[in-house]
Amino acid sequence: LHNYRNNPCVVMWSIGNEVPTQCSPVGYKVAKFLQDICHREDPTRPVTCGMDQVTCVLANGFAAMIDIPGLNYRANRYQEAYDKLPQNLILGSETASTVSSRGVYKFPVKDKKSAQYDDHQCSSYDVEACSWSNIPDEDFALADDHHWTIGQFVWTGFDYLGEPSPYDTDAWPNHSSMFGIIDLASLPKDRYYLYRSIWNKEA
């Protein structure tokens, strides 16, 4: 906190992401303890936490206590969270996790969850996601339809080694994730241009 609190790039602090204590009786206390430290050391910025256990955190007060409640995926539960929480806003602390391979196009083109193919690739049409994630269109629709969604952090900007979903149980020869907007060679996938068209109106 001390190292970065004077940096204008810092807009909020995060006290965790998908912490295992979200549903435990001590989770609320630990989160409040950490948030209080952030408030004490930097009273100018709010605090968030990336939460993936939506049922728990809405019921046990965990999400209601955080300055900016961040939901990881669960786009279908944003409205429920907004209705139940006092903050009147929701942050997409992890969004999309769409899976795609650059330059690979699968037919027929339709939305699919956890689709697998013999070539261990995913379609570049950006219509495939994991069982727990979604495609970018859902996040864009939330932002367009609800003023109380204040932004999103996409998982992920770049592919990375590890988590080769949807092939994590039959990974060979996959070593790389397929979540990235940009692949391991630093080349943009089709999704890069989709995000750019939404976020950069000058492009």
Please identify what each model-predicted range represents.
Residues 1-203:
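Extended substrate-binding grooves/exosites of carbohydrate-active enzymes
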